[in-house]
Amino acid sequence: MDINKLVLSQYIKSHPITSAKKYMRRNYFLTLQYLVASTEQQDLWSNKVMELYRRQWNQSDQREPYKSVGFITRMITGKYKFNLLLDALFISAFSNRKIGENLVDKFLLIYGKKYSEEVNMILSVFYNGYEDFFKTKIKELDKVLPILCKNRDFYNRMAKKVIITANMSAGKSTLLNALVGKNINKVQNMACTAKVHYIYNKSNEDDLIYEWDHDLELDATYEILMDDNHSNETSEIHVGTRFRSIFDVDEKVCFIDTPGVNFSRDESHKEIANTAIQTMECDLLIYLLNGENLCTEDDLEHLEFVHKNYKGPIIFLVNKMDTYRKGDDSISDTINKVISFLSEIGYADPKVYPISAYAAQLGKQAIFEGIEDEEDQDSLKTFHRKLKKPEFSYYTYYPNEVDISEYENREEYALLKNSGILHLEKMIYG
């Protein structure tokens, strides 16, 4: 499985055949099935994309043999034939141009050399992306080609890798869910296996979440995401989805979520997390601390390990200060305490900022999905009231500025700013 394909977006909802008549969808799917099978390159990705198409178009999974090339030609004619070629390239030959050229030869054998100019134009755009996009004047592909060009652009980019580490109960999974803008990670009260989660930002929003956890799911439900596949004997789970924020997140980013290192019932959590920190080449490390239980022996041990074994840039975040009360607790005093603690360990000029991961998660959920649970609604109202107070406006502790003036009348947007998540995202994505 080519892991990099997890950043590719599907375009099935923009596909013209989706709105075609039932018999045409059937003929199209059968012909596509034939073309994909003819490459003899079916892998996990191609099989799962074909399965996705079959489900979306309500097709049988039974293969039907073809008697002749002429039979195929009669099934798919007119405007859909170029979509057919693009689909076959996307499914079977995205990362292998030689296979793509063989597909083109087969296509021309079926439909005739008179389409050579258009077909070679499609091939050029498919593999060169935006570079050749404007050379293509095939109107039938107007909706699909921009998505494929964006896929190619994302696929070819170097990913920015951000590793996130913490002790248990710091709120790491909640922070990941807040950054991604979707519930893709287990929270602390769910049983977690010792796995490293890789979460990739996809090229476009296609309303699909991929998960590769021994098997590949291209439309992973919440239940699938929360239920680890016990057949997966590796220490990795990979997820692909389009990250959501109030600003477009158009960077190729991979968040690497390591297990909580002080999980007393399973020493492998610590071993896997430490190995990831020691061996992975990352652009940034985020260390999350629990503001309700700071400067513990567990934190001291892990922070010393990180200081010794990781030499890249680090952002330290203090979470769970939402229970602080004015007059009894101080955000600024807490931040200064953590800075002193880190300095004693040996960190030079540590960058420490407050965050409310839960407020950020609820804020994004309210914006993008809506909140039905009454307890979550109550928590959202509490966060609205508390975090708009000057002493609890976490964004004031960040060095950068985020302009949300166009959303100033929306409470949820103000909550995201006050929680610190928007400023953190700007530091991560640039």
Where are these regions (language model features)?
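Switch II (G3) loop of P-loop NTPases
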Residues: 182-187, 248-270
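Inter-motif core of Ras-like GTPase G domains
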Residues: 266-293, 306-312
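Conserved Switch II/interswitch segment of TRAFAC-class P-loop GTPases
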Residues: 261-263, 280-300, 321-328
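N-terminal low-complexity/disordered regulatory or targeting extensions
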Residues: 1-168, 182-243, 309, 342-343, ...
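Conserved glycine(s) of the Walker
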Residues: 171-172
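Conserved beta-strand/loop subsegment of P-loop NTPase cores
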Residues: 254, 283-289, 309-325, 333-361
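Glycine-rich phosphate-binding loops of NTPases
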Residues: 198-244, 249-250, 258, 263, ...
